[in-house]
Regions:
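Glycine-rich phosphate-binding loop of ATP-dependent small-molecule kinases
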Residues: 1-238
Length: 238
């Protein structure tokens, strides 16, 4: 068991490991939604569904949905609701989602939230949607995004500011030259932040009004963030 998962265990004396419904992780680009999803998947033993992964898979395969999504990504825009909903709907049909799942990066718009609420209400889930937002300061987000570098061979991710490779510009494992994703520039990040803030604010208010929203501090150790999310989910369930 990883140290961060142990931190979650130690942070909660008695927590149910069964989550029969969706948990939404919200947060700006670079806030750590993917990292936290990995911790919570191990803790609750439910799948992590990342719209980013779904989008990249469709774009890599060159599907019709992927080609349209690629155009939006290159412009730093959020992909249209209908495209994302279609990708998510297909994923939710998989058998591993029967006991619940963690959604990372979805819903980002009020339309997507309404669609998800409707789906949950009609699929027999006993618990309502729970939303938790990971908050990180803007300048810290910028450092996380623009400093990100990937190894094209093994996929290892570095950050030149916070987790640099031993040899500048090269992967520690493969020795390959590191690359920066086209959408990890400051200009694209600023455009994504504007789009995210404008579209996601209504989602936050939607779940806040329903009494099913919490915000946690995302600028601290991974295990502490995960423990805070677990505590928030338990509180919202009561």
């Amino acid at each position: 068991m990883s140290s961060s998962v142990v931190a979650v265990e130690q942070g909660r004396e008695a927590v149910s490991k069964t989550v029969p419904g969706p948990i939404l992780l919200l947060g700006a680009p670079g806030s750590g939604k993917g990292t936290q999803s990995d911790q919570l998947v191990k803790f609750w033993n439910i799948p992590h569904i990342s719209t980013g992964d779904l989008l990249r898979a469709n774009m890599a395969k060159g599907t019709s949905l992927g080609k349209i999504a690629q155009q939006s990504v290159n412009r730093g825009e959020l992909v249209h609701d209908s495209l994302v909903n279609e990708m998510v709907a297909a994923r939710l049909k998989e058998p591993d989602t029967a006991n619940g799942y963690i959604l990372d990066g979805f819903p980002r718009t009020l339309g997507q939230a309404t669609w998800l609420d409707g789906r949950v209400a009609t699929d027999g889930k006993s618990l309502p949607v729970i939303a938790v937002s990971i908050h990180v300061d803007y300048n810290q987000l910028l450092r996380r995004i623009t400093g990100r570098r990937n190894c094209p061979v093994c996929g290892t991710i570095y950050n030149i500011h916070m987790n640099p490779p031993k040899r500048d510009g090269f992967c520690d494992v493969e020795g390959a030259a590191l690359v920066q994703r086209a959408d990890d520039t400051e200009q694209v990040f600023q455009e994504r932040m504007r789009a995210y803030t404008g579209l996601t604010a209504p989602v936050v208010e939607h779940y806040r009004a329903l009494g099913r929203f919490a915000e946690v501090d995302g600028d601290r150790p991974i295990g502490l963030i995960a423990a805070a999310i677990v505590a928030a989910v338990e509180r919202l369930r009561k």
